[in-house]
Structure formats: structure tokens, C-alpha cells
Amino acid sequence: VIIGSLAITAERSKRIAFSRPIRFVDQLVVVRTSDTSIQELADLAGQEVTVREGSSYAEALRASSVKGIRIKAAPESLQTLDLLQRVARGEEAITVSDSDLFAAALSFAPNLRSPFKLLERQPIAWGLRKSNSDLKAAIDSYLVEHALTESREAAYRADLDEIKRRKVLRVLTRNTSSTFFIYRGEQLGFEYELAREFAKTLGVRLEVVIPPSREALLQYLESGRGDLAAAGMARTPERERRYALSAPYQFVSELLIVPAKDTKTRGLPDLKGKSIWVRKSSSYYETLSDIRDQLGFTIELLPEDLETEDVLAQVGAGKIPAAMADSNIVELELTYNNRIRSVGPVGDVVEIGWVMRQDQPALKAEVDAFMKKLYKGAFYNQMVSKYFKDPKRGRSEQSLRADKGGALSPYDGLVKKHARTYELDWRLITAQMYQESQFNPKATSWVGAKGLMQVMPRTGQELKVANLEDPDQGILAGVKLMARYSNLFNSPEIPAKDRIRFALASYNCGPGHVDDARELAREMGLSRNKWFGNVEQALLLLGKREIAKKARYGFCRCDEPVNYVSQIQQRYEHYVQIVPMR
């Protein structure tokens, strides 16, 4: 793979394949400010322009309509910034530069100017061999994922005011049957639904962050990569000392679990001289540490990335002789796993709550108020019944969880095929498809949009797709439309992540309304090139008649596309943390 600022050109495309563009640039002709003789392309006739012979700049100059441009070959090892410095010092008269490099050069060479663009919107990408089609598909998916999820890596410590200002609540959790999982494209889990309800009360977007292990949950919290941890975490003396713990929302017993075929073990005294397996970061370790010497058992440590549900599976398979688990998790596990049994509680009843940093007093107060109002209420009871009391649901959901080998949708193969052709991440298209139709190929909207991707019949005809209710054709139409809209926003000034968000908004409300919103954002002093907090805010104003009448494309019920982009972004972020690219 060639990773660098590699422009996609006709000559290069004959020899190698390219990834989807990572950005777009303008190619600028550059001279000194004192040189006023060069103002337009025609002025290059008979002039000497210094560029690398093998560069895309040389290719563009040779393809120019102006005859007589003389290319002076610079050393292939010479970087564009070095060439710009030579022009600034008067050692060369004219060169060509990407717009982003030119902007950087002005900081140390203010005597440079660009009189005109040689090429506009030149795509920059990674290069690879044409035979590496699988690698290209993986790179394309990665580039979409990186663009849309790069904010997940950002670390900042925020209390309530900052969370509301950013309009995002980052919740740290784990991918388990009792916390958060994906089932047939839908985001589910007891902790997830509680967190979503809390985010709704704050009026912010929920962002789920899944650290690589249980141990890393609190490490992420301390480093500012999340605002709170919601993963069925018990109140322990050590956690009370180091963190701010919320009011409890569950009370559980810590149960000793053995294989069902072990009929001799009736309680802890029967494990004298034997081992109990737990994670060191778990509350179980603290509980057992207080009594192991007295009762004569040993503690064996499990890997930190092993979840309690996986531990119970190993107990059932006879690989682990004894382990510990919270009573609610055991209750859920027993709906589909009859190979384990509980031999009773160890210690007192334990409180379960969310964990925050001690520098978040306002957030803790808000969470406590939420928990006290939530506990034993209608929504809470519904969630407990949904996740811990329904054996039929438990069995079906666990067998089809995306992280357990199930599919995101019934159409993963078709989505992968078409997304690959159009350089999109199949998980993004699946998130969009769920938003459009909940995976119903016969869905028809009130305005007549049809199929899995809810494409209008007239648009389907333009895209040369005949039967939108056929899953293969319906997905193809939606992917084609997303690719078309993505290409409308390939300005160098628009970040890759926002090109995708603009394309999603265009899919929902049309590119005309998005263009109107971008212009309105500029008039409001906002960025016309960023979606969240900028163009989305302007788009909402197009729902006001007095503002919409001044817009080229008029009135728009634009709360829908704003929610559409936000919900797909959220769903996609969750998909990529659980389901691999391939």
C-alpha cells in the first residue's frame, strides 16, 4: 500500500488501483507576490514551471489546453514544500502545489501567491496493486470508519455543563447480553437502554464506547475517554474510595456457580482446597479475598477481556470448576444455558450503579436524580422484564447476536457486495438500511418510497434499477444514490466525515436543502463545511416559513434529516465496535 498524498490521475489509474479518496485538494499554480505577469492559465504559454517529472502536477500541465508550457524537472526526492521555498527565495519562478500544502507554506513564506487553480477538486487516495481487490475493500471500509468515528479516540474530562455543550454523552460499557449488544441490526441491552433514556433527558446524543476489557473500563473513565461507566458495576470499598458511584438501580447477590453435573458442591465450604475463577478487577475478587484464608479455597485469575457470560459458558462446559456471577446475570444465563447451577450467595446483597469520576459532581447529581426517579418505575420494570425475565427472548437474541457470529441484517452479503463496488463501508449502509426500513424489503413510505433503502420509483428508474422491492436491486439503488450524493460534496474544504454526513442528509431531504443550509450556516457565522453544530443547526431553521421563503429550495421539515444523520451516525459507531469490517 502507498500511504501518502497520492493524487488519482488517469495515467496512474492505468497502473495501480486507488482507495476511496481520503480528501480533495485544488492544484494551485504558485509564484512570488512580486511576479504580476502570471494571472491566468494562458499566461503559462512559453513559461518554465518547475515540478517533479513523475508528479500529478506534471501530468496536469501536459494535459493542459495551453501549448508551450515548459516543464523543468525537479529532483524526484524534492518535496513540494521544498519547491515552494525555492520559489519564495527566487530560485525557481513557478511551481504547482496542492492547496493544503500551499496554505501551510504561507506560514513561513508569506511572499507566495496563487493566481489561479490548475485543477479543482483533485482526489487524494492510497495506492495499491490492482490485484488486491480484497485489500482495497478493507481499506475503503476503514477510511469510512476512521472518518466517522475518529472522535471516539478524543480524551477530555467533562462534567454536566461541558457534556451539554458538546451535546454528546459518552458511556463506557461492554458487549454482553446484559449491557449492550446488536441483534438484527438493532441496538439493545439493559444498560444501553437506561443510558439512552438518560441521554434523552439531557437532550444530548448517546455515544457508546466499548473498551477492550473490563479492566479498561475505569482506565478509560480516568483518562477522559468516557463520561461514565455503565456496565453492571458493583459498589465496592475500593471503587467508593476512587470514584463517584451513582444511586443504585439494581440490588443483586453474588452467586457461586458450578457445572450442573457437579452435584457434590453445595456451598463454599465444599470448595476447601479447590479454586474459584474470577477477574482481578471484578467485585467478586474483593468479596472472595476477604474469606479465602478462612475457608481454605484459592482464587485463580481470569483474563480481563473475558466477560461473565463467557465465564459461565466455560463453567457449563466443565473447563472451569467454579466461578462467581451476579444473580441477575445468572437469571438471564439460565434462560438459554442449563449446564450451570448456583450453590448460593456469597456475602451480602450488592448495589449496582454507574461509575463517574470524583470531578463530576454535577453529572453525579443528575444521574442520582434520574436513578431515583427511574427505579421501580414503569420503564424500569419493562426493561427488567425484557432482559432478565423472558426466556424465549433470551434464547433467540443470544443465538443471533452480531458479536456471536450472527448477522447485522438478513442481507449482509448483498450489502457487502454493493458497498464494495462503490467504496463504502457495508456497516454504514446497514445502519442506514435499518433506519430506512428496519430490513423490510416490502416497506413503502407515505410518499411512495420503496424497498430496503426506501428509494423513490422515479429515482430508481434514473439509477436503472427496475424492482426496488427486490432486496438485491433495492440495496443497489440505495448504495448508488449514496455514492452519487457523496460525490456532490468533494470540495477540499469539507472534511471526509462531513462529506458522508452531508450525503446522508441529502439522501433524506435532498441535496438542495443541504445546499440551502450550508449557505444559511455561512450567513449565521457557522461553518458551511461541518455538519454537527453547524449545518445541522441551519437546516433546522429551514422549517421556519419566514426563513425558508428566502432559500432556493424553500421549506423543509428538517428535524427529520437532522435526527436521521444523528441516529445513523450513532448506530454505525456502535456497529463498528462489535462487527469487524469483513
What do the predicted segments below correspond to?
Residues 48, 53, 275, 280, ...:
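Substrate-binding/active-site groove segments that recognize
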Residues 1-15, 57, 72-85, 98, ...:
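Extracytoplasmic small-molecule ligand-binding "clamshell" domains
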Residues 391-439, 472-475, 489-493, 578-582:
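Export/targeting segments at the very N-terminus of extracytoplasmic proteins
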Residues 33-57, 99-103, 118-162, 193-201, ...:
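Extended ligand-binding regions for polar small-molecule ligands
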Residues 17-24, 28, 72-73, 110-120, ...:
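Short beta-strand->loop
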Residues 498-574:
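Catalytic and substrate-binding regions of cell-wall glycan-acting enzymes that process beta-1,4-linked
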Residues 6-9, 25-80, 100, 170-179, ...:
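Bilobed "Venus flytrap"/periplasmic-binding protein-like clamshell domains
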Residues 3-15, 60-64, 85-120, 215, ...:
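A ligand-binding cleft/hinge motif common to bilobed small-molecule-binding domains
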